[in-house]
């Protein structure tokens, strides 16, 4: 599953690339033998003895992971590289453990030229400003010069076109990994390790394949069913096989990329949603309302109030799509924390909620809408009475026309 730290790791270069001015270039550096390159001072070794499982004691000569959350002793030196570079005007800089990426922007008075652009530094000049640190740079990894297209943390970043994709080698690697899993375990039992390996790979690439996020819960739910028993063998469920076939088909496209857009200011259009199991869904857009009354047979296993609240957001997105709202960040108010959390993550363990999120993300991707869901107390939610059948005036009713997906056609009696 996605972790918040991983999200931040990827979101920072995304913002950097999306907002990069014309002519921006980047260069990647890799520190060789990162966790073994900074030995412990001999006088400190008596205090760095560790006990192994066999009750033997070992001296830690390199102390690779630090005495605190410092990304190892070498990590502190890497941080020094960043600090000096920034003080010397070599910035902005991105760093993840042993990987460092520096950018350069065009300037009017630069002495280094590439195409029609001038810059303050090139690769050699940047390295000269930290040469006294004697950092052992990897000879085969990293870039030999600044360029417009560069790899970093496993992704290919295209600065002029402002998009991100998988490097071809990795796309083929992950495509092959999914294919082998399907060939090996469709209708056959697999181990916990087998699922964890494919799940971890797809979690990573889901940053590029955003609509794939909702194709991950079937794997994480299956992992949970093992209850940490690494020796158990289980049959992959049909839902997981279906999701993996989607991944196989999607990874088959060598031209797939994710467009990166600068994050726009968050706009408050007065968007409110609410749901009631006793009546239906209420939606407010800029003071106008619409409502969807539930069919009496709407509730089946897995469809609960949280699902209904999520569907309310989904339907709101169809309304915004019909209004041709796009390329924006929008504030959306909901009084259900479960819905806010699930849509924020892009997935849910609940099958029906997950399908709703999947449909919602199709609209978000096509309209380039970034939702900012915030909690509003029910008593302060103007959509609350609408969801309970207390409708507004006909003059203040939303009049845009749109169609519900087939999965929701029989959930509601009518659109009031």
Feature-to-residue mapping (PLM):
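C-terminal reverse transcriptase regions that engage the nucleic-acid substrate
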Residues: 144-260, 384
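Active-site palm subdomain of RNA-directed nucleic acid polymerases
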Residues: 71-125, 316-334
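Catalytic-core region of right-hand nucleic acid polymerases
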Residues: 1-75, 172-220
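Polymerase palm active-site segment centered on the conserved acidic dipeptide of motif C
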Residues: 5-6, 10, 92-94, 103-180, ...
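RNase H-like nuclease module associated with reverse transcription
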Residues: 197, 319-416
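Metal-dependent nuclease catalytic cores in nucleic-acid-processing enzymes
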Residues: 10-18, 77-86, 307-329, 358-366
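Catalytic palm active-site di-aspartate
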Residues: 28-32, 66, 89-114, 148-156, ...
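A short, polar/acidic, helix/strand-boundary loop motif
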Residues: 55-80, 285-311, 338-347, 351
